């Protein structure tokens, strides 16, 4: 699956149309609260401008329902922040394929950067529209995909644009190359023991991942609220815990398939008031023994200890989804114990994006793991064994 990278093509005086992921959080005053995604795109952008090329950046931000002009979904703050990080002027177009974008794209000089307005302001983006894609494609001499977070999607900028640029160089950026290498290596040639840790709320979100990983991993450790659906499937009492009753039969099938590989919590940290975790009645009970007026909120200390032992012996670890309500202490203890065990070990550790990436960051372990993925949905899709059309059609290395 190795693809040609941005560093491997000639960009001198050429225009590169680069799909990035600038889907950054903004506060009420439209200030960026976390610019990590912009910073992660810098190596690919610099690869072009430092070699005398021109860059046109395209991205989505949020899920706008109206047309252009809804400033809370505008990429203007991202363009401004990028200029600060690069220490140079970054041009911004108020549309994607309109007059402003066209005139600014055609007047770009070598070493300059243009950010187009939010792709999703145009309905053609989500529809994968070829006419919209053709207008974007016409602006450039080469295409670069550096948006791993949307690699599993078939949006116009991900698939129809590179299709429209057949015959021109179509490559991956640094970020996508790194993501694919880590995740592909983990799945296809892991150093063993290979352990997967899966948390989060819903079994339904992770069915295909659990299924695929049970065939590849030496152990699959389950935490988060989805553990309560497994508990219910084993005949346990789950109280008021979040469960998917329509997925109980499926949980039984996964337990039968997984056997000893599929490890479930042995105890649970529960409480009686989700809205006031600090002040709720908290107690640790055996798994499957949650009182009727309580709900499970985290794995218990025995489970944390048991999982830490498995993690310490691992050589490859994939973690997707927290063990409990990590954003509400003390229900962060299970997630913290897992993060600590990963940080203390010497395994190749890959943290799936989304909540697990936020947890690792919040708990201060981001520098102690091998790789924190930038794409929650995309990393899950790769762990399911899905092929990505957006990557498959790019040039082979």
UniProtKB/Swiss-Prot annotation:
Q: Name one Pfam family in it.
A: PGK
Which reaction is the catalytic activity of this chain?
Answer: (2R)-3-phosphoglycerate + ATP = (2R)-3-phospho-glyceroyl phosphate + ADP
- Which InterPro entries does this chain map to? Phosphoglycerate_kinase, Phosphoglycerate_kinase_CS, Phosphoglycerate_kinase_N, Phosphoglycerate_kinase_sf
What EC number(s) does its UniProt record assign?
Answer: 2.7.2.3
Keyword annotations for this protein, in alphabetical order, are: ATP-binding, Cytoplasm, Glycolysis, Kinase, Nucleotide-binding, Transferase
Supply the PROSITE patterns for this chain.
PGLYCERATE_KINASE
Give the UniProt entry's GO cellular component terms.
Answer: cytosol
Q: Which GO terms describe its biological process?
A: gluconeogenesis; glycolytic process
Leader sequence segment: none
Instruction: Specify which residues bind ATP according to the UniProt entry for this protein.
Output: 206, 296, 327, 353-356
Q: Which GO terms describe its molecular function?
A: ADP binding; ATP binding; phosphoglycerate kinase activity
Subunit text: Monomer.
Family of the protein in this entry: Belongs to the phosphoglycerate kinase family.
UniProt cross-references to PANTHER family, sorted A to Z: PHOSPHOGLYCERATE KINASE (PTHR11406), PHOSPHOGLYCERATE KINASE 1, CHLOROPLASTIC-RELATED (PTHR11406:SF23)
* Entry protein name: Phosphoglycerate kinase
Which species expresses this protein natively?
Rhodopirellula baltica (strain DSM 10527 / NCIMB 13988 / SH1)
What gene is this protein translated from? pgk
């Amino acid at each position: 699956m190795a693809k040609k990278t941005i560093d491997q093509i000639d960009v001198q005086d050429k225009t590169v149309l680069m799909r990035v992921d600038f889907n950054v959080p903004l506060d009420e005053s439209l200030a960026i609260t976390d610019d990590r995604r912009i910073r992660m795109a810098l190596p690919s952008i610099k690869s072009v401008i430092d070699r005398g090329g021109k860059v046109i950046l395209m991205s989505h931000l949020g899920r706008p329902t109206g047309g252009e002009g809804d400033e809370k979904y505008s990429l203007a703050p991202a363009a401004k922040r990028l200029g600060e990080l690069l220490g140079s002027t970054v041009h911004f177009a108020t549309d994607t394929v309109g007059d402003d974008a066209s005139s600014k794209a055609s007047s770009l000089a070598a070493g300059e950067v243009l950010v187009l307005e939010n792709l999703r302001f145009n309905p053609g983006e989500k529809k994968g529209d070829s006419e919209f894609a053709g207008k974007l494609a016409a602006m450039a001499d080469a295409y670069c995909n550096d948006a791993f977070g949307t690699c599993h999607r078939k949006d116009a900028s991900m698939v129809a644009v590179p299709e429209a640029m057949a015959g021109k160089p179509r490559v991956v950026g640094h970020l996508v190359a790194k993501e694919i290498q880590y995740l592909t290596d983990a799945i296809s040639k892991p150093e063993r023991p290979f352990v997967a840790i899966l948390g989060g709320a819903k079994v339904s979100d992770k069915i295909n991942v659990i299924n695929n990983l049970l065939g590849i991993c030496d152990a699959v450790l389950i935490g988060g609220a989805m553990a309560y659906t497994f508990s219910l499937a084993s005949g346990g009492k789950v109280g008021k815990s979040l469960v998917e009753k329509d997925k109980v039969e499926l949980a039984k099938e996964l337990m039968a398939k997984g056997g000893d590989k599929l490890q479930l919590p042995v105890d649970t940290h529960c409480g009686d008031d989700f809205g006031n975790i600090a002040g709720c009645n908290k107690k640790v009970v055996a798994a499957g023994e949650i009182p009727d007026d309580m709900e499970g909120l985290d794995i218990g200390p025995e489970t944390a200890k048991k999982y830490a032992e498995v993690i310490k012996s691992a050589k490859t670890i994939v973690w997707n989804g927290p063990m409990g309500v990590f954003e509400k202490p003390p229900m962060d203890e299970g997630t913290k114990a897992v993060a600590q065990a990963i940080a203390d070990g010497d395994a190749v550790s890959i943290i799936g994006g989304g909540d697990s990436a936020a947890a690792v960051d919040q708990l201060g372990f981001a520098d102690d793991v091998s790789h924190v993925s930038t794409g929650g949905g995309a990393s899950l899709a790769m762990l399911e064994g899905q092929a990505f059309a957006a990557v498959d059609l790019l040039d082979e290395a």
